[in-house]
Structure formats: C-alpha cells, structure tokens
Amino acid sequence: MKFPLLFISLALAAFLTRVQDADSSVISKEKSVRDGEEFPCAGTMADCRGLADNSVCCDTGKCIGEVCYY
C-alpha cells in the first residue's frame, strides 16, 4: 500500500511543479505585453503641451491639442 501512495504523491508533485513553471512563464509574457501597452512612450517625448498640432510624439504618434495620439 505504501508504494502506490508514494508514486501518486511524486507524480502529483511533478505535475504541480510543471503547472507552476508554465503559469509563471505565461504571467511574465502577459506582463511584458501589458507594460508595453501601459508605457508605449517610455524614453520618448510624450508631452504635447505647448506644441503645434501634428507634431511628432512617442516616435510614431501625433500631437492634437495637448494629447499624444499614437
């Protein structure tokens, strides 16, 4: 009776470890995508206050009023 219980416990531990590893890699991929969406202008000029309309902002965006649309 001890052998099947030990085998099942080890199999369950291995399965849970693989699920946890896969889950953390999915979370890190989702986080990198989300960070890119939340901060698309990181390191670039994104403030349009005082600039003329259609000025370039966020590398590929355009200023309209005080807002950068990209």
UniProtKB/Swiss-Prot annotation:
Cellular component terms (Gene Ontology): extracellular region
Disulfide bonds: C41-C58, C48-C63, C57-C68
Secretion signal span: 1-21
Recorded coiled-coil stretches: none
GO molecular function: toxin activity
Propeptide segment residues: 22-33
Tissue: Expressed by the venom duct.
Record keywords: Disulfide bond, Knottin, Neurotoxin, Secreted, Signal, Toxin
Subcellular location: Secreted
Domain observations: The presence of a 'disulfide through disulfide knot' structurally defines this protein as a knottin. The cysteine framework is VI/VII (C-C-CC-C-C).
Full protein name: Conotoxin Cl6.13
